[in-house]
């Protein structure tokens, strides 16, 4: 590890560190604390994966149809679990070296400069776009609560943009937490909330039963053609599996010894997390589509009309979960920016620097969310364009470079299949996502029912 450069050899405040022989890694939010264990891994990963994407899965199913929808849903779960395992295995693949950040693993595979150029922009875009979507979803949930509480007429006075501002206020406070382990309590509550609102969504749908005159065929919606909607749905599915962008950062919080490497508790936590993911995703996607067919809305909780109290509770759970999810994705961004500010620009690592960086980021994501409050369109575009590479095929490319499996062996073939499928999603899904986003921008942000 490298300490603070001599050109900025300031003495840190006593409230930041006790030892004046300061190491940068001991201050940055990803590596400041390494006392986590397998269940920290489990709930951090649940919080990271089961996010806003689960609420859009029934809508994605309606755009894909039963056959393709089920295939894509299952295939995505299997492929992403495999690439998740790859990243955990590669965290300490070289003795005495831990790849605590995604871009460090990329540098090991592609070279010091090229690795940064490939991974850092994608990871920043993934984490920033996730935070933007969570801002939008939090605002939508707050608006739904307001609508159910005061009625449609009164709710028309406020748009979803106003509720995004309210949700953002919580992130200005939570962003003050120092590192990954300091948000463990928030992440645990968020994980429980994600399971709770997912359960409410599919149980309420199942209890309601199949809607009258339900249809499962393809239909044109929101001025988006059926083929473009189909492509966009692939991006929505990809968005639902975004945990890979923080997996190494989560593993970095787990202690490691030669006798008990960090990959053991991390993989144990990942298995638990993916079982929970399956419990959340499959019932919500399948039961939601079965109940409402192609009349399901972009957010399944917006489709459910009652009982009113249950829908309010579900949206409260969504809001609490998103408070934690936002921080899980924002923490690596804070780590990158703080590292650059201290290493390259020689800023002193103080609370003022930390708060300035974090509040600026929260304000920026809030501003973009207010400008583009379109849930499904954002899922489609971001999911295909930037989530697919970091989740579906970059781990496989790195594995082929570093592990060098024998050509045409099982490992080699599996990785190339994942790469081909991931590249296809990256190319075609943003086409549908961009079309949906352009059409969404033409729609007014007016009544409660429409937004």
UniProtKB/Swiss-Prot annotation:
Subcellular location field: Cell membrane
Q: Which family does it belong to?
A: Belongs to the amino acid/polyamine transporter 2 family. Amino acid/auxin permease (AAAP) (TC 2.A.18.2) subfamily.
InterPro entries, per this entry? AA_transpt_TM
**Which of the residues are on side Extracellular?**
62-63, 137-159, 204-227, 291-309, 380, 435-451
Membrane topology, as annotated, equals: Multi-pass membrane protein
Protein name listed in UniProt: Lysine histidine transporter-like 3
Q: Which domain of life is it from?
A: Eukaryota
This chain's source organism reads Arabidopsis thaliana
- GO cellular component terms, A-Z: plasma membrane
Enumerate the UniProt keywords alphabetically: Amino-acid transport, Cell membrane, Membrane, Transmembrane, Transmembrane helix, Transport
- Location (main, coarse): membrane
| S-adenosyl-L-methionine listed as a keyword | no
Quote any Pfam family the record assigns. Aa_trans
Keyword Cell cycle among record annotations: no
Q: Which residues cross the membrane?
A: 41-61, 64-84, 116-136, 160-177, 183-203, 228-248, 270-290, 310-330, 359-379, 381-401, 414-434
- Cytoplasmic compartment: which residues? 1-40, 85-115, 178-182, 249-269, 331-358, 402-413
Query: What is a biological process (GO) this protein takes part in?
Result: amino acid transport
Gene3D superfamilies in UniProt:
Amino acid/polyamine transporter I
State the protein's purpose: Amino acid transporter.
């Amino acid at each position: 590890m490298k300490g603070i450069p001599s050109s900025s050899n300031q003495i840190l405040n006593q409230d930041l560190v006790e030892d004046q022989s300061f190491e940068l890694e001991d201050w940055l939010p990803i590596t400041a604390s390494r006392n986590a264990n397998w269940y920290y891994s489990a709930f951090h990963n649940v919080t990271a994966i089961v996010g806003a994407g689960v609420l859009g899965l029934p809508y994605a199913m309606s755009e894909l149809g039963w056959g393709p929808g089920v295939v894509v849903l299952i295939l995505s779960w299997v492929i992403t679990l495999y690439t998740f395992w790859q990243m955990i295995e590669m965290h300490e693949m070289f003795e005495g070296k831990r790849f605590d950040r995604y871009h460090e693993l990329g540098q090991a595979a592609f070279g010091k400069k090229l690795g940064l150029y490939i991974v850092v922009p994608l990871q920043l875009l993934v984490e920033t776009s996730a935070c933007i979507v969570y801002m939008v979803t939090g605002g939508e949930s707050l608006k739904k609560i307001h609508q159910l509480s005061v009625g449609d007429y009164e709710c028309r006075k406020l748009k979803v943009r106003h509720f995004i501002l309210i949700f953002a206020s919580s992130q200005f406070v939570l962003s003050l937490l120092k590192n990954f382990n300091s948000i463990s309590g928030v992440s645990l509550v968020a994980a429980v909330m994600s399971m709770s609102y997912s359960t409410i969504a599919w149980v309420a749908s199942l209890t309601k039963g199949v809607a009258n005159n339900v249809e499962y065929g393809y239909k044109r919606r929101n001025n988006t053609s059926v083929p473009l909607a189909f492509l966009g749905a692939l991006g929505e599915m990809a968005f639902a599996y975004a945990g890979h962008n923080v997996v190494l950062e989560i593993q970095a919080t787990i202690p490691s010894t030669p006798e008990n490497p960090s990959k053991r508790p991390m993989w144990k936590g990942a298995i638990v997390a993916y079982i929970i993911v399956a419990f959340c995703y499959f019932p919500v996607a399948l039961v939601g589509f079965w109940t409402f067919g192609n009349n399901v809305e972009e957010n399944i909780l917006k489709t459910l009309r009652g009982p009113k109290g249950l829908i309010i509770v579900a949206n409260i759970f969504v809001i609490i979960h998103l408070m934690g999810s936002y921080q899980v994705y924002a923490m690596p961004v804070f780590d990158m920016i703080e590292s650059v500010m201290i290493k390259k620009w020689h800023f002193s690592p103080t609370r003022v620097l930390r708060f300035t960086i974090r509040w600026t980021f929260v304000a920026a994501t809030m501003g973009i969310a207010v400008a583009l409050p379109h849930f499904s369109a954002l899922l489609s575009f971001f999911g295909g364009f930037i989530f697919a590479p970091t989740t579906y095929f970059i781990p496989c490319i790195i594995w082929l470079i570093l592990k060098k499996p024998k050509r045409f062996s099982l490992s080699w073939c599996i990785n190339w299949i994942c790469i081909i499928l991931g590249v296809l999603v990256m190319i075609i899904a943003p086409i549908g996502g961009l079309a949906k986003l352009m059409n969404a921008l033409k729609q007014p942000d007016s009544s409660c029912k429409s937004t």
